[in-house]
């Protein structure tokens, strides 16, 4: 089946066996559900498959194996095959290259940013937000509130799912991406209240969708005494337990001052 190797690669990575290779493969340049149909190549590794195919910095990557490239998720998924057909544009003309390489090997192209676009920021205002509690005067990057499912897959970040769409979730399922989810509570009304986001409760359905599709989700609960503990915590744990073995949960207790 076409792209079976790519799918196999994603399964290997999602099971945690990609390790060092995953970092080397993905660190250069994932998934917004947006149809960005091309991306500029900013560099090419020496002696790489792309270099051998005479792909150059300044070329525009159009497609891989007939698939338009929206971001690095597409890039790594479709480039995993041992036979890779790459279409680039140079000086207004499209140029097709057929590249033979070891299965899963990176093509060796570099892009303008880690994600090929902007990070998705957090749209919540959680009552216990750790970033809001950080002291001033630290490096600026520490104050950025990311909520990007791509970084969850690549770096292990936790995401709330509140800025994802059904299309995003289907793509996660199709590509077999195991991600980490900040749950906090499975009570929709309480989740909206804790996260100050009116969509937070509805997005809980994505957890069930992903778990029932066979993905493994690492979940966390920031337990705030008097708010989502007691009966609410028992409800949350019971709901998550019903999705075992596809749910792995961690319990983190926040200090009381966090939400006063």
Locations of the language-model features?
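Positively charged N-terminal leader segments that act as targeting/secretion signals
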Residues: 3-19
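PDZ/PDZ-like groove recognition
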Residues: 37-45
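Basic, Lys/Arg-rich alpha-helical nucleic-acid-recognition elements, primarily the DNA-binding modules
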Residues: 43, 57, 75
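Conserved PDZ fold ligand-binding element
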Residues: 50-70
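PDZ-domain C-terminal substructure recognizer with occasional recognition of PDZ-binding tails
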Residues: 76-111
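Conserved Radical SAM active-site core
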Residues: 94, 103-247, 254-260
